[in-house]
Amino acid sequence: MAEHLMSDVPFWQSKTLDEMSDAEWESLCDGCGQCCLHKLMDEDTDEIYFTNVACRQLNIKTCQCRNYERRFEFEPDCIKLTRENLPTFEWLPMTCAYRLLAEGKGLPAWHPLLTGSKAAMHGERISVRHIAVKESEVIDWQDHILNKPDWAQ
């Protein structure tokens, strides 16, 4: 009987991030697109500034990469989040499943693994579809910084 109960526990509750298969790891991504917004770094302080400028490969409406399998070929600066480098990505959003699970927390109620679709995530405005702009339409990237430093307010 105990074995049957174990199989009813979702993998993200029964495994550590290190124990997950590649498919399980990939499925944790809610597809919000926040990783696909460009970031700028202050050369003097190394502070990271978030913009609403979407990577050229991001389909803003669906918040999915147009060329996910070949993304590093098209975008050499694309981020590859792995089990090994996860601790170095302090900038991940507070809603990110990778971050939440690494911190011993659960998935949010709107997460696609719980709801079966991205609709709830989009409804909660977690995804970037309502703020992202196309890279090709941007003239001055600094005009698109979301977390401006005090001196630029």
UniProtKB/Swiss-Prot annotation:
Disulfide-linked positions: none
Domain of life: Bacteria
Alphabetical list of InterPro entries matching this protein: Puta_zinc/iron-chelating_dom, UCP006173
Transmembrane segments: none
Residues in the signal sequence: none
Similarity remark: Belongs to the UPF0260 family.
Protein name per Swiss-Prot or TrEMBL: UPF0260 protein YcgN
